């Protein structure tokens, strides 16, 4: 599995990458939203973890760009400022919202759910 983390907090990216790599997940990260979008065009990722509040682009906006190129992209939105309005935004882009700080177990369980949901949909779509 390949994951791209896009968050303007370098320390958060490094810690999250180390956690996921410790579980055998291939991880790349960037602190630049548009740079992350460019990375997604160059190589495929199974999952994107996006911070909502970044300097040049909101994570929810970035999710829309990513889904234009890959409608089945699996995306987790994160924020230290999660509220009901952001929850509504996350639902509107069909992405779960994780409120920072969150534990590794919670993230790993969410990743498992997203991947199993995607496998179920692909099995249903086959004739």
Residue ranges and their predicted role:
Residues 6-7, 30, 48:
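Conserved sequence signature across two-component system core domains
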Residues 14-22:
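Charged docking surfaces used in two-component/phosphorelay signaling
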Residues 24-31, 39:
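Short hydrophobic/Thr-rich beta-strand motif most characteristic of the beta2 strand and flanking loop
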Residues 31-35, 58-62:
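Acidic catalytic/metal-coordinating carboxylates
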Residues 51:
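Active-site residues of response regulator receiver
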Residues 54:
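Receiver (REC) domain active-site loop signature in two-component systems and cognate sites
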Residues 102-112, 119:
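C-terminal output helix
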């Amino acid at each position: 599995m390949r994951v791209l983390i896009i968050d303007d907090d370098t320390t958060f990216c490094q810690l999250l990458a180390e956690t996921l790599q410790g579980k055998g997940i291939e991880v790349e990260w960037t602190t630049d939203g548009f740079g992350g979008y460019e990375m997604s065009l160059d190589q495929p990722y199974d999952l994107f973890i996006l911070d909502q509040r970044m300097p040049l682009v909101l994570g929810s906006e970035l999710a829309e760009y990513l889904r234009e190129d890959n409608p089945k992209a699996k995306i987790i939105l994160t924020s230290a400022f999660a509220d009901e309005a952001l929850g509504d935004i996350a639902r509107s882009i069909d992405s779960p919202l994780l409120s920072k700080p969150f534990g590794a177990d919670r993230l790993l369980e969410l990743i498992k759910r997203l991947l199993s949901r995607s496998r179920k949909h692909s099995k249903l779509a086959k004739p």
